């Protein structure tokens, strides 16, 4: 078993997930990547491993919305790599959806992946992170990404807006449970579209914000860090519609 710390990333992908994995790997973390896209997972593993050939990087193909399959995958992560010090939930589906124009089945599938998956991940992580908090020199953290959708939704993204509000609520509940036990629960609030060419809202900046949150000492814990400006993003969206 490696002496390296471990981050588990649920919802890996070529953007934030892989960038976060690569940054943590460069800092000496072993990395577990979970996603249902097998081909993309292989590409993510290569990218993360290049960041540090001396750490272990493993892929776990799983549909995060399948709560039984996810529980089995997380158990395998523990068997392969040991207990996590950081868990990062990044699973999301960004697609148009409107009230009256979207199948309830689609909304249900979104809830399974973005909230039941988050619930399963938090339930699994809970004993591992609280145990880690008992050891000196650790920074056990449960991290997630959110956006202004949680309290300022967009009607064209009705399902995603619903899921983000529920995620925010669930993470506040987790925070209430574990904060006194030494586990940091925190999120990065993304204020717009993530694009490589954006000087602020890009995957590398978000990864850095996540890493910095994970390393905060308890007196300095933040619940939320904002990357970008949601108010400005909404103004831009309104301007585009008016045009």
Regions found by a protein language model. Give the residues of each.
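Amphipathic alpha-helical dimer-interface segment in Rossmann-like NAD(P)H-dependent oxidoreductases
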Residues: 75, 79, 113-136
């Amino acid at each position: 078993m490696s002496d390296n710390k471990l981050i588990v990333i649920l919802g890996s992908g070529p953007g934030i997930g892989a960038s976060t994995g690569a940054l943590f790997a460069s800092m000496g973390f072993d990395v577990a990547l979970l996603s249902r896209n097998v081909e993309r997972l292989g590409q993510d593993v290569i990218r993360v491993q290049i960041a540090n050939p001396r750490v272990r990087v493993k892929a776990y193909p799983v549909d995060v919305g399948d709560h039984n399959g996810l529980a089995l995958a997380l158990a395998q992560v523990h068997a392969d790599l040991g207990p996590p010090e950081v868990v990062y939930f990044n699973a999301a589906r960004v697609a148009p959806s409107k009230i009256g124009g979207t199948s309830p089945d689609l909304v249900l599938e979104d809830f399974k992946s973005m909230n039941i998956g988050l619930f399963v991940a938090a339930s699994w992580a809970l004993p591992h992170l609280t145990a880690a908090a008992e050891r000196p020199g650790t920074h056990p953290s449960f991290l997630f990404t959110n956006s202004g959708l949680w309290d300022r939704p967009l009607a064209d993204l009705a399902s995603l807006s619903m899921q983000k509000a529920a995620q925010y609520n669930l993470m506040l509940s987790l925070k209430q449970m574990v904060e006194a036990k030494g586990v940091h629960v925190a999120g990065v609030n993304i204020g717009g579209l993530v694009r490589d060419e954006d000087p602020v809202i890009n995957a590398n900046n978000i990864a850095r914000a996540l890493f910095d949150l994970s390393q905060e000492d308890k007196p300095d814990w933040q619940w939320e860090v904002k990357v970008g400006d949601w108010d400005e993003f909404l103004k831009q969206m309104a301007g585009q519609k008016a045009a």
